[in-house]
Amino acid sequence: MITLEDIKEAQRTLKNVVHRTALAYSSVLSEVTGGEIYLKMENLQKTGSFKIRGAYNKIAHLSEEERKRGVVAASAGNHAQGVALAAQIFGIPATIVMPRYAPLSKITKTRNLGAQVILEGNIFDEAYEAALRIQEKTGAVFVHPFNDPHVIAGQGTIGLEIMEDLPDVEVVVVPVGGGGLISGVSVAIKSMNPEVKVIGVQTENMPSMIASLRRGRAERVEGKPTLADGIAVKKPGDLTFELVKKYVDEMVAVNEEEIADAILFLLEQAKVVAEGAGAVGVAAVLNKLDVKGKKVAIVISGGNIDVNMIDRIINKGLVKSGRKVFIETFVMDRPGALKELLGIVAELGANVLSVFHNRSAKEVPIGFAKIELELETVDEKHVEEIERVLIAKGYEVRIVG
């Protein structure tokens, strides 16, 4: 088992290597939840996530002979970059097996850190099996993403920093995939103050740790794709499972919409960029946990989110909150008809983002044109006002988003 001394040793090992990330007070989250909320900003860590802590601590404990053989790992992103950077610092070869679906940006970043990247399999499990075959063939040391004592101790330094920076913290909320992060953090927290409540958060689409705890042993779940791909682990480790069972007080799961809303909330309200896995703790305090009157630290585990994904989340969030709307209607196919429609929209204070004019669709009567408007609006009441006024003026209106 991992001890507090193991984590303190890891902290000494990591000194001057990793960033001691800020534990930042969030006034907006505190106001919304009624708690006193602090964010542990591992999204600002080297490589954009906490993974460098465990990877570096693991490699630091290898013998010279083991380092000469190099290291191998399997990852879809964050662990890959953590291992690649740690290997680069030590000047040893690293081979990273990534699934073919891994984002191109993460593949490129891993290669730029000097690692040899091999794309193998369509899912993480297939990449993992390929990495084990490489280990067996080459003799390289396998750096497990979570089920390893030195990796867990490295991640546990986050717990030490939280306790040092906020000694009277009452609740610590941590994302959970394979369990390496929360295992280390919970050992550190509970060893220093057993009264602090440690809560883990998974996604409803991949609740492997929650399912395992219910069944009493580490078990595999098939799950579904999730925005929180960084914690999409089908089976927790045997070691991490035992540590979570011993030290973690509660586990909750959040759904995809709650994760997307949390990403947008952090971006817009707190000015924090978080990936899906990094945002699940915030999703939990916004939707699942009562933290009113409590002093709470939430680990923002990473910020490696694809720009295209941010764009989709923002647009969906704008539609959901009534700040963007898509309207379909019909106008007479004559000069000035479109201008008249747009004039009404302008008078109502909506900004036209795009217009699509269609005479040819089979549902369009002869002599008419179908108009699709993308509008920037204030809120849902504004959308309702636009719909009401257009209907009153004789337009057939359909809100499509």
UniProtKB/Swiss-Prot annotation:
Keyword Transit peptide included in the entry's annotation: no
Keyword annotations of the record: Amino-acid biosynthesis, Branched-chain amino acid biosynthesis, Isoleucine biosynthesis, Lyase, Pyridoxal phosphate
Pathways per UniProt: Amino-acid biosynthesis; L-isoleucine biosynthesis; 2-oxobutanoate from L-threonine: step 1/1
Catalysed conversion reaction: L-threonine = 2-oxobutanoate + NH4(+); L-serine = pyruvate + NH4(+)
EC number: 4.3.1.19, 4.3.1.17
Temperature dependence: Optimum temperature is 90 degrees Celsius with L-threonine as substrate. Activity is not detected at 50 or 60 degrees Celsius. It increases from 70 to 90 degrees Celsius, peaks at 90 degrees Celsius and decreases from 90 to 95 degrees Celsius.
GO biological-process terms attached to the record: isoleucine biosynthetic process; L-serine catabolic process; threonine catabolic process
Domain (ACT): residue spans on this chain: 326-401
Regulation: Activity is insensitive to allosteric regulators L-valine and L-isoleucine at low concentrations, while these L-amino acids are inhibitors at high concentrations. Is insensitive to ammonium chloride and AMP. Inhibited in the presence of aminoxyacetic acid (AOAA), an inhibitor of pyridoxal phosphate-dependent enzymes.
Cofactors demanded by this protein: pyridoxal 5'-phosphate
A Pfam family matched in the record: ACT
Entry's Gene Ontology molecular function annotations: L-serine ammonia-lyase activity; pyridoxal phosphate binding; threonine deaminase activity
Binding residue positions for pyridoxal 5'-phosphate: N78, G178, G179, G180, L181, S301
Subunit composition and interactions: Homotetramer.
Family: Belongs to the serine/threonine dehydratase family.
Protein's job: Catalyzes the conversion of L-threonine to 2-oxobutanoate and ammonia. Can also use L-serine, but the catalytic efficiency toward L-threonine is about sixfold higher than that toward L-serine. Also shows weak activity toward L-allo-threonine, but cannot use the corresponding D-amino acids. Does not exhibit racemase activity toward various amino acids, including serine. Physiologically, is likely involved in the threonine-dependent pathway of isoleucine biosynthesis.
Name of this chain's protein: L-threonine ammonia-lyase
